[in-house]
Design a protein with these regions (language model features):
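ATP-dependent helicase/translocase motor core
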Residues: 1-53, 57-75, 92-96, 115, ...
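Short basic/glycine-enriched coil/helix segment immediately N-terminal to the Walker B
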Residues: 39-42, 113-115, 130-141
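Hydrophobic positions in the central parallel beta-sheet of the AAA+
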Residues: 47, 119-121, 143
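Conserved RecA-like ASCE P-loop NTPase motor core of nucleic-acid helicases/translocases
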Residues: 74-83
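Conserved helix-turn-beta segment of the N-terminal RecA-like "Helicase ATP-binding" lobe
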Residues: 84-110
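Conserved motor-coupling elements within RecA-like helicase/translocase cores
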Residues: 109-119
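Conserved helicase/translocase P-loop NTPase motor core
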Residues: 117-130
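SF2 helicase catalytic motif II
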Residues: 124, 133-176
Length: 177
């Protein structure tokens, strides 16, 4: 419980006992992701949805499904964003969906991670710590890049070119940027 609170000014402990169910539009996106992967073999996907529609919840539900489909695997997760606040906010949907108040570690700003298996990291920290030197190309099974419209920037190229996850999921409200 202490670890869950170290990233927060508010108490979120009650949400870790609830079943998080997707809204119908979120379920439609989840179904489309599953079809793209199963039918077409596309494992690098982009979710485009308006701000506030729960793209992070969609990614957490999709990650949970991925883990259920791969029992016995470590299901290592790398969640990348360009701002600390986004990373802090993104932890809660994953913890709620997975019902695990201790899931995930922040590696951004003054936060130091004890483990890199389920990591929420800023792209700046990723690059400044030469993270690819610490992990193999297939270390992460599932990678989420939030605000994916930033991925065209040079700062994201090392990440996207190096890693070979089973799933790469981009999230954005504005793909045209």
């Amino acid at each position: 419980a202490l670890k869950a609170e170290k990233y927060s000014e508010t108490d979120h402990s009650g949400i870790y006992t609830l079943d998080i169910q997707p809204y119908s539009y979120q379920q439609e996106i989840l179904d489309k992701l599953e079809a793209e992967r199963a039918v077409r073999g596309h494992t690098r996907n982009l979710v485009v949805a308006a701000t506030g529609t729960g793209k992070t919840v969609i990614s957490a539900l999709d990650y949970k499904r991925f883990c259920k489909q791969h029992p016995g695997k470590p299901c290592r997760l790398l969640f990348v964003a360009h701002r600390e606040e986004i990373l802090k906010q993104s932890l809660y949907p994953f913890r709620a969906v997975l019902k695990d108040a201790n899931f995930g570690e922040l590696l951004v700003g003054n936060y130091k991670a004890d483990s890199i298996d389920h990591l929420f990291i800023s792209i700046q920290t990723f690059n400044s710590q030469d993270f690819t030197a610490k992990t193999g190309a297939d270390f992460y099974d599932y990678i989420v890049v939030d605000e994916f419209h930033h991925a065209a920037a040079p700062t994201y190229q090392k990440l996207l070119e190096y890693y070979q996850p089973q799933i790469l999921l981009g999230l954005t409200a504005t793909p045209e940027r």
